Amino acid sequence: MKILLAVDGSPCSDAAVEEVARRPWPEGSTIKVLTAYELPMPPTPEAWALPLDYFKDLDVALQKQARNTVDRAIQTLKAKLDKSILLDGVLLPGPPRTLILDEAESWQADLILVGSHGYRAWERLLLGSVSQAVVSHAKCSVEVVRLRD
């Protein structure tokens, strides 16, 4: 079985990691832990006043944070899952919803797991919902894990 676990380092994402870690997956399953990172704002003419290395340094910092997020999830899974489960980590630059869907399709995932931030209507309108986009457009099963109160 191929399981794609999308993480972003948030408490909701941590809940999805814990959900994956507590399940008895079929022997030989592969869990791919994916995180996407992107600049919080596109470079605009106003940004030209910033130092030349600003966006490069920001990209390096975002990559480091993404790597730490993936590594932390993999360590949690390694500690709790059967040794027959294969673990892989990937960090990709770009919008999360697109990258999750593209990776799931190209890898032929059987299941995608994502955490839900539980945004209300106004927040969803402003920020968008990665989990909603994945549920709506994925070609495989999707599980949205909610943070327990």
Segments and roles (model prediction):
Residues L111-A133:
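Glycine-rich, Arg-bearing micro-motifs that act as flexible, cationic patches
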Residues K32-L34, D88-L92, E143-V145:
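General small-molecule cofactor/ligand-binding pocket signal
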Residues K2-K56:
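Small/aliphatic-rich secondary-structure junction motif
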Residues R22, Q75-I112, D149:
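Structural beta-alpha unit
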Residues D53-N68:
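A short acidic, glycine-rich active-site loop
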Residues T35, G115-H117, L147:
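Short secondary-structure boundary segments
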